[in-house]
Each structure stands twice: as C-alpha cells, then as structure tokens.
C-alpha cells in the first residue's frame, strides 16, 4: 500500500499496523512535548485509502485472499448494455466517460459454495478480512468471527471489490458513518462524483452509497468502485427504473434481477432492498402528514398498487439471497415506509414494515447472507429508543443503520445538525451505522463542501456515542485534546481536531500571527481572563501547598480541607494574597 502524502495536517502521517503480512491503515498524530515531558503520538482510525490516479484505480488489496480460498471462479459475466447507463446514454449512443482502467472478469462462487463472511464465520473460519478488522478495531479476531457468525455484525466485502479495506458494522464495534453521493437528472458528472468519494473518505466516511439517478449510472458506479477503499452501497431499484423509462408499473423481476447481477459483477458491497413494503401496509400511510418519503419505498408502493400484488422484491427474496451468497453482497433492508416528519414517527406503517424486515433478516441468514436493517428518518428525541429496542427484538440484533434521525422539522439548511442530535442518541442506544445528512437535505444535491460538512458532523455524532457507550479507547482522543488545550499546545489542538482546516481558520481570523500559536490565551477571553491560564497560574503558584494540604480529589467525601491544619493553611494563603494586592497576575 502506498502511503498518502497529502495529509489533512502536517502533524499527521500514514502509520499502518503491520502484523502477519497485513498492513492495516492508521493515522499517527505527532504531538509536542508537555511541560512535564514528551507525549506519545496519538493514533486514529483511517478510511481514506492510498493515494492513486483516479483513471487507474486502487490496488487490488484482497484479490489474493479471495482466490486463495479456492471457492470462486472467473466467468464471462453478463453482456454490457447501453441502457445500463440510462436513457441519456441511449440518446448519445455511448457513455460520457468510459472506465479504461483495469477490469478483470467477474468472480462468483463455485457451484454449491457460499462465499460470504457469515458462511466462513459460521464454519469457524477466521478469514484475512476478519483478521484485518480485528487489528483495525483493536479486538480479538475470534470476537470478530463470533459477532459475524451470529449476525450481530457484518463485513461488507463483495468478491468483485478487492480494492476495499475490510471494515465491520456492528454495535459492539466503533460506530460507523455512511456518506451518500451520486448524480441526479439535473446536475453533476462522473469526475465530480469520484471527487466526492475521495473527499468523503478523506474526512472519515466508513462506507459510501452511490445513489446516482441521472446520466451514466453504470459508468459512474464503475469509476467509484474502482477508486473506493471503503464498501460501496447502492439502491438498485433506481437503475432498474431508468431501464423501464421511469415508469414504476413497468418494472418486473427480470429487469431487476439483471440489474442486481450487473451490480454484483461490478463489486457493489451492499444493496438497499425495499422488500418489506407490503401491499397491506400502504393504506396505513394515507393519514400521514408526509406520506411515503423514501424514493425506493414510493416506487415499490406504486408498483404494488398498479399490480395489486406483493412486490417482486418480496416474492423473489429467496432468489435474491441465492444471488447475494454467490458474491458476498450484504442486504441493507430498506425502510421504505420510514417517517418523513415528526408527526409520522413510530406509526403503524413504520413498525409493520420493521417487523417484516425482521422476518426477512432471518430468511437471509438461512443463506448465510449478511444483513443490516435500515431505520428512520424523522423521530422526536423521546421516541428514538423505541426504534432501537424493536429493531433489536424483531431483527435479532442485526446491525441497525439509520438516517439521522432528524429530531425537529424546522431547520432547512441545518438538517445536518437536527439529524446529528438524533444520530448521537440512537447510536448511544445501539445503532451500528449512521447515514449522514448534509446541509442540503430537503433542498438540493450536496456539493463537495456539503459532503465534508455532513461527514464531520456525523463523525462527531458517532464519536460522542462511542464515548457514551464506554467503547474502549474512545475517550482517549478527547483526553488528548483536553490536555493539549490546557497546555496551550495550539498546533496539537489543530492536529487532533476532526477538521484542522476549520479550527485553524477560526483561530487565525483574530490571531493570525505565528506567535499566537504558542500564546497562553485565545481571542475569546484575551490574556487576562483566560480561565485555563488562571488555572495554570494557580497551580504554579500554590501547587506545592495544595499538595501538602492534601486537597481532596473529585468525589472525595472525606474532606481533608475541613481539618484544622488545612483551614489554618488556607487562611495564611488568603492573607498573603490580599497583602500582595489581591491580583491573580502580579505585575
């Protein structure tokens, strides 16, 4: 693996964990010395992958692991069709920017084999992917295997996406975040979407979903997968709809199955399938304030009503499982009836679908297919935990993957914040992955800056949840920042920040000179009113006396201060302070 040169801060460097032939990426942050001595470098999780030319794609990290197991083979694959790139490509006669990098023949399981991480885990096999994840999460590989075997965690790694660096989604591991990218019929290009992918993973996206609905759907996805170090998810019904000229009623199993296989062969790692939208549940949405807000959910609801039968996704679910088991594609069982407003939260339609999704989860597990369950949406704070509890009950602890939820509907332009509040809350209660929301939610297609804002905001929510859950090592990052802050190590504060660029920019707006990077104050309070500087001065002036007096620690109820010796000592210091002019900073 080639180290990335373009780090987000000069104190950052690529510093992998190397063990048993594996090279697991981490970022090392070099810290300055404290007054009391040197600080060890701080290490953080890294998602960005190696530096590469987007026209060539990433190294095929997992290729040898996959083929060494001896249970897959290459085959010719389906014929590439122009309609795969949508109606605009049909009119032009070609895709706008064909992928010309490496594209080996696709792999799939040999007859009678299932090549999923769940199948291996249930057979007692610890794969290289599991070993990689264990090093990345700083846990035992057997623990990883057991969680995957039970369905409580997934490692989404299609055999046709060998460029991906294994990661795990489960509530006993670090909370992960997903970033959505993808073009629309109105805007964006292949180059822009690849740039968004690289930008999202640079700032910490653990997975990326390509939700393209516009031009060059197939080709855009090819560029994204070949350049992605993280798992790629899709909602295949979007592309299938494009193949039938956008008419939901004209969709059928044959078109959808062909689209699924197309995406499996390309290397999509997980797919959102709205198989829980049943005909009987649609009338339950009629009294809602915002109806059905999921694009996939509305497409399938329209199809069910047009044909007055259960969807082909539900009727052919077992065949979907068989296909996914041949490529190790994970289900992301979509919540097509999720609430789109607080008024509709936790209603009969939402929970009826969730219960069906739980049943589908068990069916997928019969085929050793990995599953995560999608969740809301828009939910008031006081109603969030019920979603965790019912998902864990009905879906047997399969990883929960939620969009927020947004906890208020009054802040267009700030929905990254309204949703991050709910995201931190629901992740604290057990949700394994959070789908980011950008400031453009409900308003427009996010650009590169919006992607960064969404990722940073959701990294905050995920980390806050990990701290609250007591995840091993989570608070160490906060403690390192707090120590740097108290010691006025400004450059270390910037380096330890989720977004060093913004931290530096805000600091330098008022104190741009280089000496300000070592000053014992900031522009908020100035030099005379900085609480941390005053606290440091108190330690410097009275530290020995405080230690001698046996000042109690936090929660120490023995109250050594109450002793007569302590009272006399404090009185003496009080007289000295007043006699000296009663100034904290003596001139």
Curated annotation (Swiss-Prot):
Chain intervals with Basic and acidic residues compositional bias: 17-33
Region (Disordered): 1-58
Cellular component GO terms, alphabetical: cytosol
Catalytic activity field: 5-amino-1-(5-phospho-beta-D-ribosyl)imidazole + S-adenosyl-L-methionine = 4-amino-2-methyl-5-(phosphooxymethyl)pyrimidine + CO + 5'-deoxyadenosine + formate + L-methionine + 3 H(+)
Pfam family, one: ThiC-associated
EC number: 4.1.99.17
Chain sites annotated for binding [4Fe-4S] cluster: 522, 525, 530
InterPro entries recorded: ThiC, ThiC-associated_dom, ThiC/Bza_core_dom, ThiC/BzaA/B
Cofactor note: Binds 1 [4Fe-4S] cluster per subunit. The cluster is coordinated with 3 cysteines and an exchangeable S-adenosyl-L-methionine.
Residue positions binding substrate: 180, 209, 238, 274, 294-296, 335-338, 374, 401
Record's keyword terms, sorted: 4Fe-4S, Iron, Iron-sulfur, Lyase, Metal-binding, S-adenosyl-L-methionine, Thiamine biosynthesis, Zinc
Biological process according to GO: thiamine biosynthetic process; thiamine diphosphate biosynthetic process
Cofactor dependency: [4Fe-4S] cluster
Pathway: Cofactor biosynthesis; thiamine diphosphate biosynthesis
Stated family: Belongs to the ThiC family.
Physiological role: Catalyzes the synthesis of the hydroxymethylpyrimidine phosphate (HMP-P) moiety of thiamine from aminoimidazole ribotide (AIR) in a radical S-adenosyl-L-methionine (SAM)-dependent reaction.
Name of the protein in its database record: Phosphomethylpyrimidine synthase
Native source species: Corynebacterium glutamicum (strain ATCC 13032 / DSM 20300 / JCM 1318 / BCRC 11384 / CCUG 27702 / LMG 3730 / NBRC 12168 / NCIMB 10025 / NRRL B-2784 / 534)
Name of the encoding gene: thiC
């Amino acid at each position: 693996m080639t180290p990335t040169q373009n780090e987000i801060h000069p104190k950052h460097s690529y510093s992998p964990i190397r063990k048993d032939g594996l090279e697991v990426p981490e970022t090392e942050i070099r810290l300055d010395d404290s007054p009391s001595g040197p600080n060890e470098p701080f290490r953080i999780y890294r998602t960005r992958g190696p530096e590469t030319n987007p026209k060539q794609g990433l190294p095929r990290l997992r290729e040898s692991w996959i083929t060494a197991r001896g249970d897959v083979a290459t085959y010719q694959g389906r014929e590439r069709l122009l309609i795969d790139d949508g109606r605009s490509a049909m009119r032009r006669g070609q895709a706008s920017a064909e992928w010309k990098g490496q594209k080996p023949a696709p792999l799939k399981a040999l007859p009678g084999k299932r090549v999923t991480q769940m199948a291996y885990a249930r057979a007692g096999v610890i794969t290289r992917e599991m070993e990689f994840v264990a090093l990345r999460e700083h846990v035992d590989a057997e623990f990883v295997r057991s969680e995957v075997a039970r369905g409580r965690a997934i490692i989404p790694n299609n055999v046709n996406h060998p460029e991906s660096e294994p990661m795990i989604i489960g509530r006993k591991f670090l909370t992960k975040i997903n970033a959505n990218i993808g073009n629309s019929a109105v805007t964006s290009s292949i180059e822009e979407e690849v740039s968004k992918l690289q930008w999202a993973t640079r700032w910490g996206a653990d997975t990326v979903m390509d939700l393209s609905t516009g031009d060059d759907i197939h080709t855009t996805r090819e560029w994204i997968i070949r350049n992605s170090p993280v798992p790629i998810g899709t909602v295949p019904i979007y592309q299938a709809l494009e193949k039938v000229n956008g008419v939901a009623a004209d969709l059928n199993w044959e078109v959808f199955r062909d689209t699924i296989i197309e995406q499996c062969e390309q290397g999509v790692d997980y797919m959102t399938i709205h198989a829980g939208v049943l005909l009987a549940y649609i009338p339950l949405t009629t009294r809602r304030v915002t109806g059905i807000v999921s694009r996939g959910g509305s497409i399938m609801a329209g199809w069910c009503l047009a044909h007055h039968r259960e969807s082909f996704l539900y009727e052919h679910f077992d065949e979907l499982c068989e296909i996914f088991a041949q490529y190790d594609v994970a289900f992301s069982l979509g919540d097509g009836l999720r609430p789109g407003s607080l008024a509709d939260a936790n209603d009969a339609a939402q929970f009826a679908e969730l219960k069906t999704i739980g049943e589908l989860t068990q069916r997928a597990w019969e085929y050793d297919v990995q599953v995560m369950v999608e969740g809301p949406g828009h939910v008031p704070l006081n109603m969030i935990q019920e979603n965790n509890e019912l998902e864990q009950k009905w879906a047997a602890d399969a990883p929960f993957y939620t969009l927020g939820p947004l906890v208020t509907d009054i802040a267009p332009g700030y929905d990254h914040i309204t949703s991050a509040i709910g995201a931190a809350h629901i992740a604290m209660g057990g949700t394994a992955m959070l789908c980011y929301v950008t400031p453009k939610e409900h308003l427009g297609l996010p650009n590169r800056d919006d992607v960064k804002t969404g990722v940073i905001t959701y990294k905050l929510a995920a980390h806050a949840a990990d701290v609250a859950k007591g995840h091993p090592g989570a608070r160490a990052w906060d403690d390192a920042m707090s120590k740097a802050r108290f010691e006025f190590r400004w450059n270390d504060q910037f380096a330890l920040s989720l977004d060093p660029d913004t931290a530096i920019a805000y600091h330098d707006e008022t104190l741009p000179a280089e000496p300000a990077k070592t000053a014992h104050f900031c522009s908020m309070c100035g030099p005379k009113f900085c609480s941390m500087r005053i606290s440091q001065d108190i330690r410097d002036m009275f530290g020995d006396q405080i230690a001698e007096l046996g000042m109690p620690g936090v929660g120490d109820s023995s109250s050594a201060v109450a002793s007569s010796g302590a009272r006399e000592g404090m009185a003496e210091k009080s007289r000295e302070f007043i006699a000296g002019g009663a100034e904290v900073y003596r001139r």
